[in-house]
Amino acid sequence: MSSTLIVQLDMRTLCQEADVSADWVIEIVEHGIVEPSGRTPEEWVFDDRAPVTLKRAVKLHQELELEWEGVALALELLEEVQQLRSENSMLKQRLGRFTQM
């Protein structure tokens, strides 16, 4: 029997992990870059992927001087590229089985 560990972070912990201010987290949430559970910032709970996403978002915002809307789009496109690469790799493996026969 296997169990799944679910990690959730509150606002303070997320800010510490991602080295981001609460004001930026609120702004990033407003643009849909990360989506917490809870109604207010005091109640927000984030999943374990949120610190990485926040760090990437802040880096794009600062280094490329993108507005948050542009950051959201860039992150969405980067995720889509990663998914396509994974799918392509899987399809290559499946195709390789047929060509080795």
UniProtKB/Swiss-Prot annotation:
Q: Which InterPro entries match?
A: CbpM
Q: Which domain of life is it from?
A: Bacteria
The record, for Pfam families, names: MerR_2
Coiled-coil stretches are: none
Signal peptide start and end residues: none
Q: Which HAMAP family match?
A: CbpM
Family, per entry:
Belongs to the CbpM family.
* Chain's role: Interacts with CbpA and inhibits both the DnaJ-like co-chaperone activity and the DNA binding activity of CbpA. Together with CbpA, modulates the activity of the DnaK chaperone system. Does not inhibit the co-chaperone activity of DnaJ.
Annotated protein name in UniProt: Chaperone modulatory protein CbpM
Q: What is the lineage of its organism?
A: Bacteria, Pseudomonadati, Pseudomonadota, Gammaproteobacteria, Pseudomonadales
